[in-house]
Amino acid sequence: MRFTKSIKFSLKCGRFFIMFTTMLVKKFSPKFTALFRTLLYAIFALIILCLLVDRGISFYVRDKIFTNIDELPFRPCALVLGTSKYTVSGKPNVYYDSRLMAAKSLIEQQKVNYLLLSGDNRTLQYNEPRAMFRDLRKMGVPKTLMFRDFAGFRTLDSVIRADKIFQVKTFTIVSQKFHCERALLIAQAHNIDAICFVAKQPELHFSTQIREVFARIKAVFDLILGVEPYFLGEPQPLPNSTTL
């Protein structure tokens, strides 16, 4: 229903925009007007395509997203997707804090047996898996239940490496809903059995929503082109849940 309403609203806005701009260019030559109208239609079609991809992804993975921990099926492992601990302004990142709280709750509620912390590790000063590991230890999660993937540079890397490198064949992704949806798209495209437990998130700013639309477009192109993680290598299987 929400998907249909979004498309109808976009079409109404598009028609109004085209009518308004067409009125503005009537003073120009017919040749210029035709060129402008063609360009306008192309831009409008591109916007509609982006919205279709964005809403289509949300609809496609809707059955694999869980917000209630009581309804979440058990999986041996949770893949916790990394993000920066602090914002650009130096304030605590609520997305980061919420993901750690969600990961901790999965351990406490015995919805998973261990955590795979995956994130960026490009420099000595910026290390998402290390930060998550340290903070989860402070939150009381035993270090024996946590493993780190230092090559989770992108969502695509984190999801595929969990399967190919760490040999985790079924797992729960932990992140905010908009991020979960993109991660699940990647997982399903690679025949990876994954579900998602949604971490709490603040109200999304418009800029965040726009960035996510473009991130989803890029994810679709990556899947079409068969883009692989930056780093693969020898498998490093995580212990079976029965050994923990």
UniProtKB/Swiss-Prot annotation:
Stretches assigned to the Periplasmic side: 53-244
Its gene is: sanA
Note the Pfam families from the entry: DUF218
Q: What is this protein called?
A: Protein SanA homolog
Q: Which residues lie on this side of the membrane: Cytoplasmic?
A: 1-31
Please report the record's description of how this protein sits within the membrane: Single-pass membrane protein
Would you say which domain of life the source belongs to?
Bacteria
Q: Which InterPro entries match?
A: Cell_Envelope_Assoc (IPR051599), DUF218 (IPR003848)
Where in or outside the cell? Cell inner membrane
